[in-house]
Amino acid sequence: MNEQYEKSLSKLELDKVLSLLADHASSQAAKDRCMAIRPSADADEIRHLLEETSAACKCITIKGSPSFGGLYDVGASLDRAYRGGCLSPEELLRIAGVLRAARQAKSYAEGEGVQEASVLDLYFQQITSNKYLEERIFNSILSKDEIADAASSELASIRRKIRQQSAKIRESLQKIITSPSYAKILQEPIVTIRSDRFVVPVKAECKGQLPGLVHDVSSSGSTYFIEPMSAVNGNNELRELFMAERKEIERILAELSAESADHREQIKLDYDVLLELECIFARARLSFAMRAICPEVRTDGQLNLIRARHPLITGKTVVPISVRLGSDFDTLIITGPNTGGKTVTLKTIGLLTLMAECGLHIPADDGSSINVYEQVFADIGDEQSIEQSLSTFSSHTKNIVEILKVCDRDSLVLFDELCAGTDPAEGAALAIAIIEFCRKCGAGVAATTHYAELKLYAMRTSGVMNASCEFNVETLQPTYRLLIGVPGKSNAFAISKRLGLDDGILEQARSLVSQNDVNFEDVLTQLDQQRQEMEKAKEEAERLRRETEKQKEKSDEYYAQIKQEKEKAAQQARKEAQFIIDDARHAADAVYEELKQLRKQAKNGAFIPGSNEKQAGMRRSLNAVSYTHLRAHETLSDL
């Protein structure tokens, strides 16, 4: 990676975006790794990185963000333990922190949520939790300065004896400091500790009146800290207990160190994987913070940013831009007013390309794509060097010379106010020649300029496109909208007129401008007016289209409702017709059965009074039932 490329990364402020990324990581190691990220020129690698970021976004959406707290680089400590070294409590706590983070990550991966396979699965599958060792360390070590009594039964026993012995010594010394015979020689009636031994503070002039061992003297020399002879044996026993305690603590630390060394390789792997996962999820959290999307990655030279936003410009004031490069043109000439957004446009193109090459989602709309460039070069900003006595023009030219030495077909070159700060005619000629050189190298180019000659150059040259940052002459304010295919026009006369400059002065100024320039600006003005009229017509057409769609939706809803009600009525009618059919069928069956019985009785010679009339009535009922049955069937057929 050459020096000029590194300078361009700085000018495009990639480091500031990486700093935002680092803010979304918790461990210092992950923050450092985020800051060390550099763009990749491998399209497959970039796609894989972006896929990882997207997968992490999905995980966060479904089941929240995992915790990576307690991650420390414990490799050196594990290596020392492997060689037989005894680790400090702080080192062991850091190892336990990695083990806890590994267990939590494993639990996160195995929890409910995302079901389908993900590129993150390989990372999570490499993690192995060791809850036994994790809890063993945390239960044994309370802090970097304190070992728990529960670390071993022997340590608990020793400390119990220490407390008992300390109480015994204090009790004996308490008798001395409360004795009236010693009241005059004591500086204070207290028991204190010096060199792990209990002592009492005695006035310097009375030190010979209390038999014992002197362990310390106050800075003023007025107080001697004396261990009375009656406490020597007790203090000796206490000292032996302290030595036994230290020995037991060393044994415990050595044991925990050895156990950690046994799992050295897995703990190292866990740390590496967790660190990578933390950086991936930091990328995902940044994506949410920026409302970013995963762009398409191309290698055919085509870049297309839809409603892209510069990630370092926050608030409601940011105006999205849509810009493309490499489809029907490989060079973009951007003109427009100062502070109108030209430089921001250049930076947005360059920075979003670099972000994607780092595996970061970009703040733009869906459908955006970036092209993979091996190097992105930018000549942006005033780098005038007083020490080198370089003018602004010379400083930029020196920078451009270095860029031209290394740019090629895999480069994106961004020029801000190309060849400004010198004679306009010569500056414009130089600018065109520099752009042509880059184009012959096959590089993609975007340049901002005030030179009218470059507008004409773009209009006459195949593969070169004009663009402009819109300016509202009525409000005298830039709108920050980027207009592809529309060259920027000079607004000096219009602005001066609105600000109240005398008409006579304006007319004289116009007469001093060449007729060709006047005609060119008039053409640009007409084009701009036509563009605005077309945009208004387009907006009106869009409004009418939306209204038509809204009316169509209402009509569709109305007809759907009518159809639903009709179907509901038909279903009810079918139910009623079916009920009539079923009822008629039951009635017919009853009539047939009764008629059958009458015929059977008549056949047997039995006399049935009124049987003829009864049979005739039954036949009429049967005919009525048949008619009802037929009409119900016809109704069902109609439905």
Label each PLM-derived region with a short phrase.
Residues 158, 162-165, 241, 245-280:
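Intracellular alpha-helical coupling/juxtamembrane segments of multi-pass membrane proteins
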Residues 160-203:
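Extended, Lys/Arg-enriched charged tracts that mediate electrostatic binding to polyanionic substrates
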Residues 85-92, 504-607:
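C-terminal helical "lid" subdomain and adjoining coupling/linker elements of P-loop NTPases
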Residues 628-635:
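Conserved small/polar residues in nucleotide/adenosyl-binding loops
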Residues 190, 194-225, 235, 297-320:
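SMC-family hinge/dimerization module
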Residues 1-154, 158, 263-266, 270-284:
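Conserved amphipathic alpha-helical "coupling/scaffold" segments
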Residues 177-193, 284-307, 465-467:
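Long, charged, glycine-rich C-terminal linkers/tails
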